[in-house]
């Protein structure tokens, strides 16, 4: 049975809620089972025991083949509504189900993206920094997938947004020209790698120069660092760490310097440790978000977050990772824009819900925190929605009432009115197609 008591082959006009089982990723940078929000969510969502020896990094909700969501039927939460982990996974994926029931996406979404769910929804638990990476634009994604399908597994672009659940740290985009000059003047190890001539080019730049000139110099600088030999990087990092440890005895290190020391412990002799000086070091409080367009460098450093993106798993990596590195592609694809990223604080759409709208058609995210004995309405949207319950319990009502609790994941078709209520408090997130897309 489905969440509303219907079979997995739905009639046209289905307006219920479809309960899902997500996929988990056990990457090295994730948090231990006991400390990981992802591990807890996966245990509650799937009813499976978690491996205490594993790191739990990502919980995926969507249709991507690398981590599909499955329809849940019979038993457990489906029959009695409670979080006892007894749900049975159907053989049908959400992707299969949508292809059989395309009307659930809504006419506007179907005409733009076909039967593909436009967004991929995730929860991340980060203990150790992720790789310095960027996601290709649509044209580059098509090319990379064609040339290296085992590495780049689809042909879609991957703009994304991270919404902090806890205090959250990230490297995001290149620092301003003014900050870059300070780095060149105060981090001699960078000059040792790139040479005095290139360092002088940076210092000679000014705000009146054409933007493309600045981008060209920054590209040369970044490429020289990322392309340096392992021996050179090992040598200069040893000098850097020694210098910072000595400085730490006479003055308090800057946040960036402390970050670099921490990264070196996680990734000894890795070029990404030195490259970190070139990026904005961003700290988010819970409820704050940052977004990343195609071809923008970034590395999540620490914390837990909700993440939403276009449906893709394409990542070009070049530092802070044991995985495949593609330095040439990364250095050639970046925009080399400089300056601080925009931090989103959300816009209130009702007393309990904040909406985060990045400049991408594929997705938006709502953060809903209901106090005890409260009710909120999610009016029908022209596109589909995905909900994940992060805490508490309550009910979600469409054509029928469904009891929900922490770990539940539900898919709502387009044009579905939903009322959410709780007597004890409820914390959930919704992903949907960007509402601005429907206003165009």
Model-derived features: where do they sit?
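Ligand-binding loop in jelly-roll beta-barrel domains
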Residues: 116, 124-129, 136-139, 154-160, ...
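C-terminal, non-catalytic macromolecule-binding modules
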Residues: 303-355
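Conserved short histidine dyad/triad with adjacent acidic residue
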Residues: 349-352, 364-381
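A short beta-strand-loop-beta hairpin characteristic of the jelly-roll/cupin
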Residues: 69-75, 94-110, 114, 173-176, ...
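Contiguous mid-protein beta-loop-alpha structural module that forms a pocket-lining wall or clamp
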Residues: 203-324
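Tight coil/turn sites that cap or link beta-strands
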Residues: 286-287, 293-295, 371-373, 392, ...
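Transition-metal
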Residues: 1-249, 322-340, 365-367
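His/acidic/aromatic-lined binding-pocket segments of jelly-roll/cupin-type domains
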Residues: 122-123, 130-131, 160, 281-282, ...
């Amino acid at each position: 049975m489905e969440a509303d008591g219907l079979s997995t082959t739905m009639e046209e006009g289905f307006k219920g809620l479809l309960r899902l089982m997500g996929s988990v990723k056990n990457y090295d940078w994730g948090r231990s089972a006991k400390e990981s929000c992802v591990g807890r969510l996966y245990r509650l969502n799937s009813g499976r025991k978690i491996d205490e020896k594993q790191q739990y990094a990502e919980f995926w909700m969507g249709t991507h083949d690398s981590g599909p969501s499955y329809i849940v039927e019979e038993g457990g939460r489906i029959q009695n509504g409670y979080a006892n982990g007894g749900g049975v996974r159907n053989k049908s994926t959400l992707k299969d189900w949508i292809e059989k029931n395309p009307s659930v996406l809504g006419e506007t979404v179907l005409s733009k993206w076909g039967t593909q769910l436009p967004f991929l929804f995730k929860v991340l638990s980060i203990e150790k920094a992720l790789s310095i990476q960027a996601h290709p634009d649509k044209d580059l994604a098509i090319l990379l997938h064609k040339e290296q399908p085992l590495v780049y597994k689809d042909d879609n672009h991957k703009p994304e947004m991270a919404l902090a659940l806890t205090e959250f740290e990230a490297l995001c985009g290149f620092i301003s020209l003014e900050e870059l000059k300070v780095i060149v003047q105060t981090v001699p190890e960078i000059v040792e790698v790139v040479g005095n001539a290139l360092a002088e080019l940076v210092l000679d730049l000014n705000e009146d120069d054409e933007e493309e000139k600045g981008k060209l110099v920054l590209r040369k600088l970044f490429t020289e660092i990322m392309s340096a030999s392992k021996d050179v990087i090992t040598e200069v990092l040893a000098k850097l760490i020694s210098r910072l440890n000595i400085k730490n005895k006479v003055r308090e290190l800057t946040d960036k310097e402390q970050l670099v020391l921490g990264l070196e412990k996680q990734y000894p002799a890795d070029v990404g440790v030195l490259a970190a000086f070139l990026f904005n070091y961003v700290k988010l409080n819970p409820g704050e978000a940052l977004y990343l367009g195609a071809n923008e460098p970034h590395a999540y450093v620490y914390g837990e977050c909700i993440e939403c993106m276009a449906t893709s798993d394409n990542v070009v990596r070049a530092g802070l990772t044991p995985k495949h590195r593609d330095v040439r592609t990364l250095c050639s694809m970046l925009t080399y824009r400089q300056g601080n990223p925009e931090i989103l604080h959300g816009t209130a759409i009702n007393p309990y819900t904040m909406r985060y709208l990045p400049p991408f058609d594929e997705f938006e995210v709502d953060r809903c925190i209901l106090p005890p004995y409260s009710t909120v309405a999610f009016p029908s949207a022209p596109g589909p929605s995905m909900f994940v319950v992060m805490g508490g319990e309550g009910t979600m009502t469409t054509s029928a009432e469904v009891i929900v609790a922490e770990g539940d994941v539900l898919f709502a078709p387009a044009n579905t009115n939903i009322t959410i209520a709780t007597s004890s408090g409820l914390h959930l997130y919704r992903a949907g197609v960007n509402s601005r897309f429907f206003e165009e």
